[in-house]
């Protein structure tokens, strides 16, 4: 049987990959968005694992809320990237740092 420790190990690996993805690849905004999604997935796995282990549904409901927020964040982030790419022709983070505003 799979215990909570197994879920925590998978979640820790996903969280670490997400954090490393942000720190290692700072040039591509799409990769940074995918790394943030990995971090949110790791958080969701933790919420569901502890919720199932404790027999409480609050963690699972909150996990659905986090999934909804993550989907909205991804959609808005990609829409902003498409508009930025059409205007500038690149999605490099270095060029985004020079934005006016």
Swiss-Prot record:
Its main location: membrane. It is an enzyme of class 7 (translocase). One of its GO terms (molecular function) is NADH:ubiquinone reductase (non-electrogenic) activity. One of its GO terms (biological process) is ATP synthesis coupled electron transport. It comes from the Bacteria. It is a multi-pass membrane protein. It catalyses: a quinone + NADH + 5 H(+)(in) = a quinol + NAD(+) + 4 H(+)(out). Its EC number is 7.1.1.-. Keywords: Cell inner membrane, Cell membrane, Membrane, NAD, Quinone, Translocase, Transmembrane, Transmembrane helix, Transport, Ubiquinone. It is found in: Cell inner membrane. The chain crosses the membrane at residues 4-24, 29-49, 65-85. Coiled coil: none annotated. Belongs to the complex I subunit 4L family. NDH-1 shuttles electrons from NADH, via FMN and iron-sulfur (Fe-S) centers, to quinones in the respiratory chain. The immediate electron acceptor for the enzyme in this species is believed to be ubiquinone. Couples the redox reaction to proton translocation (for every two electrons transferred, four hydrogen ions are translocated across the cytoplasmic membrane), and thus conserves the redox energy in a proton gradient. NDH-1 is composed of 14 different subunits. Subunits NuoA, H, J, K, L, M, N constitute the membrane sector of the complex. This is NADH-quinone oxidoreductase subunit K. It comes from Sphingopyxis alaskensis (strain DSM 13593 / LMG 18877 / RB2256) (Sphingomonas alaskensis). The gene is nuoK.
